[in-house]
């Protein structure tokens, strides 16, 4: 029944999704304003969702242009559906323009198809179809739309300062059948304090180093600019050998007497950096072989001592595992250095319930002082957990099982979704076990089958939660 309902809307679903995907809704602080708190792209995507909601007869409520909601249903309790329309930067290497959606016979290709614009449109159409069916709602629905999920969650922080907290809810921003627990997440900077000037002449001076754009992405590109005082050819040959030995792509050029070294890695979501290749850490590994100036030497030595080849916090003394939630993970997402201001490592750390976060950070902060580094802690989100046997979770899982015959149990993840904003919040779809996960990677796509099947599952689940009860 539900799949047949969705079939009647397939063309509309694709057209509305294409319109949303065409908006480059990447956070841009340089263009932020009161009207566009995280830049014009995210604001435009939020307005787009309001426009299609108004077209279809729904009411909306805007919260300072950084978040808002689409309203449906009636009743005392509120089901929250928490989505986001911002996306991570596209990066390089796409086979098509990431913001000009390509629709093939069986897929849609663009940045945001999986994370989170495709699932957002799927959830929206589930609500729209039920409204078109004139169902007798027993709950209200707030489809809450954020614009800063990929960075600092300013959107939901602002939203929940003044707006009603849903009784229960889900975020269509992960996988089926249901994610009932999420690791704690924090970002922090390891900031280098500048050392005294060199007493002895070094052979090489690191002028600048840059790798990574987002704390929650493994950097796939790194660039170092090095002043080489002698033996330029030897350095280039050593670098080429290093690339070959480590199965890496990279390049070396000379720009106005400065040696420019680049390394290409593999970008993946920061919740599991072990499956990516961190270009920045590899390039620092090479630089450690050079007789660099004091500051640079301390910077690259720190990377090798604590960060390189340590995706589970081993070198930082933070290795920890639980059977329910898995391991601590550490993603070094941003690395910068210049010879005027010294360096910085931007880290995204995720941890399971039971990890003594404050104790571990205090110990680490004290330990690294001797190497000229300090910790600047950002936002800390504690682990989030809902019992998988809760009736709410079971209703979601039942809708999934009815349509897929897949009896996989709900599980926990290292990723963080808006679900953790709610006491009784879980992540629910929209990826299936056979979906290719290209979130935060080039050539991100969603299959039409996945898009329509997710819509159908959301349709049944929302009906079960908001109409039958």
From Swiss-Prot:
- Annotated protein name in UniProt: Putative dipeptidase SAB1611c
Name the positions where Zn(2+) 1 binds: 115, 150, 440
Active site (record annotation): 86, 149 (proton acceptor)
What enzyme category does the UniProt record give? hydrolase
Q: Does the keyword Ion transport apply?
A: no
Alphabetized UniProt keyword annotations:
Dipeptidase, Hydrolase, Metal-binding, Metalloprotease, Protease, Zinc
**What are the EC numbers?**
3.4.13.-
NCBIfam families this protein is in?
dipeptidaselike (TIGR01887), PRK07318.1 (NF005591)
Look up keyword Transferase and say if it applies: no
């Amino acid at each position: 029944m539900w799949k047949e309902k969705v079939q009647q809307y397939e063309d509309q679903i694709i057209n509305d999704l294409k319109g949303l995907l065409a908006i480059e809704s990447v956070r841009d602080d340089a263009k932020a304003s009161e009207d566009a708190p995280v830049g014009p792209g995210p604001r435009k995507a939020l307005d787009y969702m309001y426009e299609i909601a108004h077209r279809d007869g729904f009411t909306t409520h805007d919260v300072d242009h950084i978040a808002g909601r689409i309203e449906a249903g009636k009743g005392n309790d509120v089901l929250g559906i928490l989505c986001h329309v911002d996306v991570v930067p596209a990066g390089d290497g796409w086979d098509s323009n990431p913001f000009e959606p390509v629709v093939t016979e069986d897929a849609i290709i663009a940045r945001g198809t999986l994370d989170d614009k495709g699932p957002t449109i799927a959830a929206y159409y589930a609500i729209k179809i039920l409204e078109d069916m004139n169902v007798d709602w027993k709950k209200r629905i707030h489809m809450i739309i954020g614009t800063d999920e990929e960075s600092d969650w300013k959107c939901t922080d602002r939203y929940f300062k003044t707006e009603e907290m849903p009784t229960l809810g889900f975020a269509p921003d992960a996988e089926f059948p249901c994610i009932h627990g999420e690791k704690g997440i924090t970002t922090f900077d390891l900031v280098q304090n500048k050392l005294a000037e060199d007493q002895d002449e070094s052979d090489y001076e690191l002028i600048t180093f840059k790798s990574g754009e987002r704390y929650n992405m493994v950097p796939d590109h790194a660039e170092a600019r090095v002043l080489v005082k002698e033996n330029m050819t030897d350095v280039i040959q050593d670098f080429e050998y290093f690339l070959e030995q480590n199965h890496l792509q990279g390049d070396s050029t000379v720009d106005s007497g400065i040696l420019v070294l680049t390394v290409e890695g593999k970008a993946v979501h920061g919740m599991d950096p072990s499956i990516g290749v961190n270009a920045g850490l590899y390039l620092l590994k090479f630089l450690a072989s050079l007789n660099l100036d004091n500051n640079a030497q301390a910077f690259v030595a720190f990377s090798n001592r604590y960060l390189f080849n340590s995706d589970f916090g081993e070198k930082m003394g933070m290795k920890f595992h639980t059977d329910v939630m898995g391991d601590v993970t550490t993603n070094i997402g941003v690395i910068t250095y210049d010879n005027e201001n010294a360096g910085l490592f931007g880290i995204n750390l995720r941890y399971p319930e039971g990890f003594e976060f404050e104790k571990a950070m205090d110990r680490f902060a004290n330990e690294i002082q001797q190497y000229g580094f300090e910790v600047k802690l950002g936002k800390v989100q504690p682990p989030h957990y809902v019992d998988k046997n809760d009736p709410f979770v079971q209703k979601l899982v039942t809708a999934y099982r009815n349509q897929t015959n897949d009896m996989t149990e709900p599980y926990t993840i290292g990723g963080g979704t808006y679900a953790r904003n709610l006491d009784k919040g879980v992540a629910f779809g929209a990826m299936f076990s056979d979906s290719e996960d290209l979130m935060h990677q080039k050539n991100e796509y969603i299959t039409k089958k996945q898009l329509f099947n997710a819509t159908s599952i959301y349709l049944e689940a929302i009906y079960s939660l908001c109409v039958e009860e």
